[in-house]
Amino acid sequence: IQKEGLVENAAELGKYMLEQLYLLKEKHSTIGDVRGRGLLVGVELVLNQEEKTPANDLAEDVLYRCLNKGLSFKLSMGNVMTLTPPLIIKKAQIELSLEIIDQSLSEAEKAL
C-alpha cells in the first residue's frame, strides 16, 4: 500500500471525484447530497431538494442505466449511490465513470 502510494492516490482522486460530483449536483436537481472520504463516496438521489424526498425508483433506474454502460456500484438505503472504486483507479477512469453517471442521470430524469 505504501510502496504503490495507494493512500495518497485515494486522497487525491477522492478529492477530485467529490469536486466533480458537486458540479454534477449543480446540474442535476435530483442529487440531494454528495458526501465521502477518499474513494468512498455516497450520492443521495432525491425527488425534491427542499424536502429531500428519497428517489428510490430513480436510483434503481440510474443503477441499471449505468450497468448497461459498464459502471457498477451499490445502492444503499434505496436511494444512495455508493461509489467505491479500487484504490488503484486512474483519473481517466474516474472521469469516464462520472460521464456515465451524468448521462444515466439525464436519461433517467427525462423518463420521470
Q: What are the functions of these language-model segments?
A:
Residues 1-112:
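Conserved N-terminal phosphate-binding loop of PLP-dependent enzymes in the Aspartate aminotransferase
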